[in-house]
Regions:
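C-terminal recognition in membrane/secretory proteostasis and scaffolding
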Residues: 1-188
Length: 188
């Protein structure tokens, strides 16, 4: 979400009625929050779009980050009803609250003098990718010799998909010593 002034929100489709309601409830407020980006394949990807104007969460007007963060922090593992306006239409969506700690790297694997961990939410957001794959923090000897650069995301080894660090570990443990294998990755 990013803050946007009312003048820009009207161009995005905020109705006059909603603007009047927000201005009456929060006279000092100069705008609302807008969806800037949605992580591909996330739980919200099918419900929210960039440009959606956030109006309410669980029936309460939300105009700033702090109240939004408080509601979301208290909604981990629960559903929340989010009301947005898109192109002049009010839409209500039920979204599942996620714990950011669950999609933040908390372990790593050292392999062939390299360092690998799961792709973090922050990196996925920055790269506009699903939170899937393994991040190459340091390619080390094995991946460096294969010219796989630091900052790449490993998505597969051989015929196997790599969705997370557990997949990566399982696959590399099964590889015989000195065996070469195809690695699918993306780099930015």
């Amino acid at each position: 979400f990013v803050p946007k002034p009312f003048a820009e929100l009207r161009r995005l489709g905020l109705t006059r009625e909603t603007e009047a309601r927000v201005r009456a409830a929060y006279p000092q407020q100069t705008g609302l929050l807008v969806v800037e980006q949605v992580i591909p394949e996330s739980k919200a990807a099918s419900d929210l779009e960039p440009g959606d104007v956030l109006v309410e969460v669980d029936g309460k007007l939300i105009a700033e980050f702090v109240p939004l963060a408080a509601v979301l922090d208290n909604s981990v593992g629960k559903e929340v009803t989010v009301a947005v306006e898109r192109g002049g239409q009010r839409l209500e969506r039920r979204l599942q609250g996620d714990n950011l700690n669950d999609i933040t790297p908390d372990e790593y694997i050292e392999y062939g003098d390299g360092v690998f961990h799961k792709l973090s939410y922050q990196q996925a957001r920055h790269l506009y990718r699903p939170v899937s794959g393994v991040y190459v923090a340091n390619p080390g000897y094995v991946f460096g010799k294969a010219a796989i650069p630091r900052g790449s995301i490993v998505t597969g080894i051989g015929a196997e998909d790599v969705k997370d660090l557990d997949d990566f570990e399982r696959i590399i443990e099964m590889l015989p010593d000195q065996q070469q294998e195809t690695v699918r990755y993306v780099s930015f």
